[in-house]
């Protein structure tokens, strides 16, 4: 590349870089100007804090700035990396001061300041000094000029109060000129009327010296103002218009000094001083100019009537009389050159044409009655006739203005007063009218509600609420019924002391019993339900309570429950009387409400189970005669279970107790005389300790399964069990010796066992007499829950084996009888002293050490239902043999009770300890996979792998010794792979003998040679 080409390229690149630099600089300057504009607005906000302490507080707590002075919604925030500006802050401050002074001289110096004599309540001079601290010179010059001109004598007030002609009048161009000179608009002169009224005597606030040159707009104005630089002038004009509307409306509504009854009392007469009539004469002397000013600020409304235009014009005049102009620009009056006819026409046009207003018309004016509208029209006609009667004068200038002012002073207050009276009367009439209308509406509603024949569109609001409450009460009643059932069962599971079971009664939910309400209510059923439940009587509560208490609880417990229910039912009488007034009407809509709780579902399930069991009771009545023996064992079983569960209220732990043969004999005679039904539940501990008789409630024998869950047990079985226990105590013969009394069952001494075993059928295969050696049958139930009796201490140690014969069992029984004769005092006391409450596990291997009683006597839950008919049949024929001779009965008494010789379970009887069991081999990872090779999918070999040359080469390599090619395999040296910085230190310890192939545990040379021969390497 030549030098010329490189030079051209360099020049192009230089020009391009310069263009980029210029573009970036322009963009940067624009961003800086935008950012500085945004920063100025925020600094103006911060400068509202006019004391140093406020600024220091903001510095210490910068979060307040975020809360109070957040970024305006429409202000653009530009983030850019700004270089250090070379412009000094002093020059910026100087420019701000110059711009502020120029702004006041150009636009805001036109503001006319009212003297203190006009309004003594507002300290306007203080606020003027507060807002215009840096421009006192220009504002004072304007004020002095106005006062000096107004105090000249012999001249009409209008000519005296004329402003200098060199000041520009109010127009949109002046606003543009004002705001285009400096982008930051300055605060207007007049504050809001509320601030003026609140601070009449405040001292001027001291501004911070650093911000004394800044005058700020309000924060609301900044938020409403769009921040675009191109539309700043238009937004400023619209902002001034909005501000004028708001200020005028605020003055009309909030200023306490202005009253509509006396609108123009403050208007001065022609002989008053010129300073006091400065602004009012200016407004009243040229209504056409005033209208032109308003039309330039606010768009005209043409839908207002003449009376509204009249009131609005008078209100505007009063508002301008009592405040400073919010726009900060005064309009100058011109020399009047028109004749009195033209002035009269302008007055007529002002009075009759629609006038622009700043405020919305109040509702009391727009809602005139016809009579008031007629009066208003008559008033306007009268005003028009008064205008025509005005004296016509040909004198131009001050005479015309004075006559026009006289007309306004004389006529307008009277008309405004009349209009105000009409407005007040119309407002009162409107309030009375609305009140009457509301009263009529209420009367119609009451008539409709009282007339029951009329069907309302919607049902009353109280009726669904009552339905929900009634449904909730019924659900609560079911909860109480279920809680009572659980309460009776908790008494069974309570501990030794009966006081604890009594404490459970006091924890019953205090909800009265109410008849159930489970079906969906309709018009008829809801009425019937309300009529039945609106007055809950104590008899209904008692009848429901008697169902659960009469047959299951002692008299003391019955009285306690009845008293508690009576106390609970008392506070409901008042509620029932109130609810009875709001019963469902026949015309009300059907309400489908049902409150379903978990307890309600549980209660329904319990009722379903009872219904099924009741159906089974009818079928079992036929076989009752053949089951008397079974009931004898079940009765004794229930007694044993009752005594045991008082000690240990566990869910699936049952007890083992000892019984004397005499007790069993007496029990058998008692049951044979009067058969009882099967007990379904466990009596409470408190009822067991009490000796009070219970009412006997005869029930049909059932085959209801006994569940371990106590909440599903019927409480009516308590009385039956306790009644039988009392009968046994009364019918016990007194001829027994003292040892017999010591052999009686004691409820306080029990023995706990774990879950029963599953080997009942196993021992039936060998000898059926072993299954019933204790004369106590096993409860056959799906939950495999039962209790067995402990006959003696010796039976714990000497248990029967499965493989023994009957002769060996008889020898053992004789030994047990001899031990009992030596130790007459035995039973639970002996068991407790020797073994304590030692838990005996039944689910052990039958061929291991015999460490539990009655091993394998109980069926599993899966086979219990299928074996139940056989067990009940066997219980009738099996002899009642115990482990001692005293418990055995002669065979002549029961010839049918013989041990069946047939083996019903041949599979279990053939088992012995020496039986060998063959198990399948365990699948191992080291097993041969030759069997699975056929099942594996064949691998698709590539074409090169199937070439005959490759196969020949592989066959030749099979005889090569890999040690000759690759060398001997050396042991792994961890230090070689993981080298440490310090060679002297060994990071890894040497391997042990079990894995150290480099030590003596290596292969011998003979083993190596043998391996090579087998592989064909040698």
From Swiss-Prot:
The modification Phosphoserine is found at residue 171. Transmembrane segments: none annotated. Residues 570-580, 624-644, 665-679, 692-702 have a biased composition (Basic and acidic residues). Residues 189-199, 268-287, 329-339, 522-554, 645-664, 705-719, 784-808 have a biased composition (Polar residues). One of its GO terms (cellular component) is mitotic spindle. Keywords: Chromosome partition, Cytoplasm, Cytoskeleton, Nucleus, Phosphoprotein. Disulfide bonds: none annotated. Residues 309-320, 890-902 have a biased composition (Low complexity). One of its GO terms (biological process) is regulation of mitotic cytokinesis. Pfam families: INCENP_ARK-bind. It comes from the Eukaryota. Component of the CPC complex at least composed of ark1, bir1 and pic1. This is Inner centromere protein pic1. It comes from Schizosaccharomyces pombe (strain 972 / ATCC 24843).
